[in-house]
């Protein structure tokens, strides 16, 4: 009724004053006006009812429980499994010659141009939970140094790992050794050449045994230690009755600086009850490097005792090796990235593999090696490098990753080509 009076007054106000003076509203006019007011009141009531119904529906929807999505089905055993791979390949020309004491020169079988797939790794990692995991990595080697036409396949890694925390993890089986894989990570160009002791056969990358490692102080200090068979990952047999030890401690006082020392002691898997073993091989390693996004520079050093002299007789006869034979060498390496895709790099190695002087020579064997190159990285998993390598050994031979280099007078090894790496 309140609304009706308001409308009536409004309508009355709209009527011109002279009209009111001339004629009073009739009963029919009043009845019509009341009918209009009732119609408006009915429409207003309907509008209010519709608004209330809408509000009730919204409240009903808001108060309804949110449906719980169905729980995803847990993946099978393959859910924690990843597969990775890495390949080292090259197309290059090699010129290798040996010169004897009479001055005669002989070309090596590697002489010429060829393509090689030097390494092809396939790795399978499986994570059981946050503590336990396992890894198997195969190592394929094709046409090694041009001397073998078959495919050599090895189990490079096969281990079970328990990682209790950042400070302590342990692996049982064939796994990375403390020094060579660490040095490869600092060097950065393993696909071009192995690092110092791996190139000259004074160390290897993996072996069978028990391996512990960890880090302290938010990466300030890292350590690794291995108790191993000593014969390397290519040999798995109970042919030795001793355990070899290898260890490393590295420090990063700042993010870009790495300082490390390491060591090895053992009989390299050659000790058993049927072999006379007179010596124990030992090795000391050191490394210092600076690395950032553009610059990589470092130096690596090693010294070894009786590394190639485990089974030599106490009083040597004709063999060159003698008791307490000593070896040492160093490597300097560096690279500079002009852009994230283009970098130049280089390296120089000097090695004295033995202190023994062969008859007719003027001193012990000495090996000089260097490489220089330009690396192009179109994508993070790909590297293509144009490389030149040069090696010269005097007064004898040295067994290296590129073959047996040298001559009784001297020997040279030159290689130029395209070297690549594919990682997935």
Residue ranges, per PLM feature:
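Positively charged n-region of N-terminal signal peptides that target proteins for export
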Residues: 1-4
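N-terminal periplasmic/intermembrane-space "pro-region" immediately following the signal or transit peptide
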Residues: 6-11, 20-102, 424
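N-terminal signal peptide c-region/cleavage motif recognized by signal peptidases
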Residues: 16-18
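A general secondary-structure boundary signal
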Residues: 29-36, 40, 47, 79-81, ...
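Outer membrane beta-barrel
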Residues: 70-101, 109-231, 239-261, 333-338, ...
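Outer-membrane beta-barrel pore domains
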Residues: 95-98, 107-109, 146-148, 158-163, ...
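Active-site-proximal beta-alpha loop/turn segments in soluble metabolic enzymes
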Residues: 226-236, 266-273
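Alpha-helix capping and helix-loop boundary segments enriched in small/acidic/polar residues
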Residues: 236-237, 408
